[in-house]
Amino acid sequence: MLKQRTLKNPIRATGVGLHTGKPIQLTLLPAPADFGIVFRRVDLNPPVEIPANPYNVGETTLSTCLIKGDVRVSTVEHLMSAMAGLGVDNAVIELDSAEIPIMDGSAGPFVFLIQSAGVLEQDAPKKFLRVKKEVTLRDGDKYASFTPFDGFKVNFSIEFDHPVFRDRRPQTEVEFSTASFVKEVSRARTFGFMHEIEYLRSKGLAQGGSMANAIVVGEYRILNEDGLRFEDEFVKHKILDAIGDLYMLGHGLLADFRAHKSGHSLNNRALRLLLEQKDAWEWVTFEDEQPVPIDYLRPLAVA
């Protein structure tokens, strides 16, 4: 049986908020089977819990933000992507701020945290949403689609009219597994244009943004001294974001997800559209000895 997973031990980290620029303390805690992933704001009295759920996603302009009443937790997508990558189904994420720390702008530090905590199998089957027929959402020249696939594959393409992007690969595809996620996707950093960052700062946002946690693109070139971590880092980060946004489902997907110029909003709206079309999908588990279509590292290897 392919089992659900949680963290073996609690683990704590500190980082800086992308928008506030202030220190944030983050604690990842184990949770029981069928609990899901829940964010807990411990800076509030009483603490407020917001489950990771596509219908709790509110603001998506600069990141994926979970909202419950007037309480929010933003920039959750990189941590959610790491949870998906290591197959964690159940966890409590405590934080003392309205945003998850940006760390280095990728999911790499969160992968390291989860690996350091260890991963524990639970006595309950891991659930997947298996897509049975195509569901596509179009918005002008952008689109996001789900088609049937025996596994989870993400194909993403981007388009920017800018010198830095003209000679780089605008499209790439990753067949999801723990190994491919950690090696090919997790270290891809978020990116932004210098003029946009300056504008955001003038509005009191992106106070914690720097070349230590983002690829900064100037008028003609990448401004980071050490350049890119790999040639297709821009589009790989879009795949990282999409994996995190789609993991708001709370379960793994068995589908071929293809997107062009998609972002947090379109990813979320496409996921909601899929859920609304109940004849397009089904829940499945792998409780016998049948082959499992996604290769997760064994917990001993993860730990």
UniProtKB/Swiss-Prot annotation:
<dbReference type="GO" id="GO:0016020">
    <property type="term" value="C:membrane"/>
</dbReference>
<feature type="binding site">
    <location>
        <position position="78"/>
    </location>
    <ligand>
        <name>Zn(2+)</name>
    </ligand>
</feature>
<feature type="binding site">
    <location>
        <position position="237"/>
    </location>
    <ligand>
        <name>Zn(2+)</name>
    </ligand>
</feature>
<dbReference type="InterPro" id="IPR015870">
    <property type="entry name" value="UDP-acyl_N-AcGlcN_deAcase_N"/>
</dbReference>
<comment type="function">
    <text>Catalyzes the hydrolysis of UDP-3-O-myristoyl-N-acetylglucosamine to form UDP-3-O-myristoylglucosamine and acetate, the committed step in lipid A biosynthesis.</text>
</comment>
<feature type="active site" description="Proton donor">
    <location>
        <position position="264"/>
    </location>
</feature>
<dbReference type="GO" id="GO:0009245">
    <property type="term" value="P:lipid A biosynthetic process"/>
</dbReference>
<dbReference type="InterPro" id="IPR004463">
    <property type="entry name" value="UDP-acyl_GlcNac_deAcase"/>
</dbReference>
<keyword id="KW-0378">Hydrolase</keyword>
<dbReference type="InterPro" id="IPR011334">
    <property type="entry name" value="UDP-acyl_GlcNac_deAcase_C"/>
</dbReference>
<dbReference type="GO" id="GO:0046872">
    <property type="term" value="F:metal ion binding"/>
</dbReference>
<keyword id="KW-0862">Zinc</keyword>
<feature type="binding site">
    <location>
        <position position="241"/>
    </location>
    <ligand>
        <name>Zn(2+)</name>
    </ligand>
</feature>
<dbReference type="InterPro" id="IPR020568">
    <property type="entry name" value="Ribosomal_Su5_D2-typ_SF"/>
</dbReference>
<keyword id="KW-0443">Lipid metabolism</keyword>
<comment type="similarity">
    <text>Belongs to the LpxC family.</text>
</comment>
<comment type="pathway">
    <text>Glycolipid biosynthesis; lipid IV(A) biosynthesis; lipid IV(A) from (3R)-3-hydroxytetradecanoyl-[acyl-carrier-protein] and UDP-N-acetyl-alpha-D-glucosamine: step 2/6.</text>
</comment>
<dbReference type="Pfam" id="PF03331">
    <property type="entry name" value="LpxC"/>
</dbReference>
<keyword id="KW-0441">Lipid A biosynthesis</keyword>
<keyword id="KW-0479">Metal-binding</keyword>
<keyword id="KW-0444">Lipid biosynthesis</keyword>
<protein>
    <recommendedName>
        <fullName>UDP-3-O-acyl-N-acetylglucosamine deacetylase</fullName>
        <ecNumber>3.5.1.108</ecNumber>
    </recommendedName>
</protein>
<dbReference type="GO" id="GO:0103117">
    <property type="term" value="F:UDP-3-O-acyl-N-acetylglucosamine deacetylase activity"/>
</dbReference>
